UniProtKB/Swiss-Prot annotation:
The keyword Ion transport does not apply. Pfam families: DUF2499. InterPro entries: Uncharacterised_Ycf49. It comes from Cyanophora paradoxa. Its main location: plastid. It is a multi-pass membrane protein. It comes from the Eukaryota. It is found in: Plastid, Cyanelle membrane. The gene is ycf49. Belongs to the ycf49 family. The chain crosses the membrane at residues 9-29, 41-61, 71-91. This is Uncharacterized protein ycf49.
Length: 102
C-alpha cells in the first residue's frame, strides 16, 4: 500500500466516494421525478463504481502481478459503463421526446 502517495490515495478514494454519492443522489432524483428511464443511468454509474474499485484494489496490494487481471477488468468495465451511459442517454432522450408529443 506504500507505492502511492497520500495525495494519490486521496484522489482514488474520493473518486469511489463520488460514485457512491452520484448513485445515491440519482436514486433520490429518480424517486422524486418518478421517471423510470432515469434508472438506466444508475446501472451505468454502478459499473463505473466497480471500475474505480478495481483500481483501488490493485493499488492496495502494491500492484502485485497476481492482481494484474484487474487492469483488464477495469478497462472492460470502463468501456462497458461508457456504452451503457450512451444508451441511457438515448433512452432518456426518447422518453423526453415521447412526453413532449403528448
Amino acid at each position: 500500500m506504500n507505492v502511492l502517495s497520500y495525495f494519490t490515495w486521496f484522489v482514488h478514494l474520493s473518486s469511489v466516494l463520488e460514485w457512491l454519492n452520484i448513485i445515491y443522489f440519482f436514486l433520490l432524483y429518480t424517486k422524486l421525478k418518478k421517471n423510470l428511464s432515469l434508472k438506466t443511468f444508475i446501472f451505468s454509474f454502478f459499473i463505473s463504481f466497480c471500475s474505480a474499485l478495481c483500481a483501488c484494489t490493485l493499488h492496495f496490494f502494491n500492484n502485485q502481478s497476481f492482481y494484474y487481471f484487474l487492469i483488464n477488468l477495469q478497462s472492460f468495465l470502463t468501456l462497458f459503463a461508457n456504452i451503457t451511459l450512451y444508451f441511457s442517454i438515448l433512452i432518456y432522450k426518447q422518453q423526453i421526446l415521447k412526453n413532449q408529443n403528448y
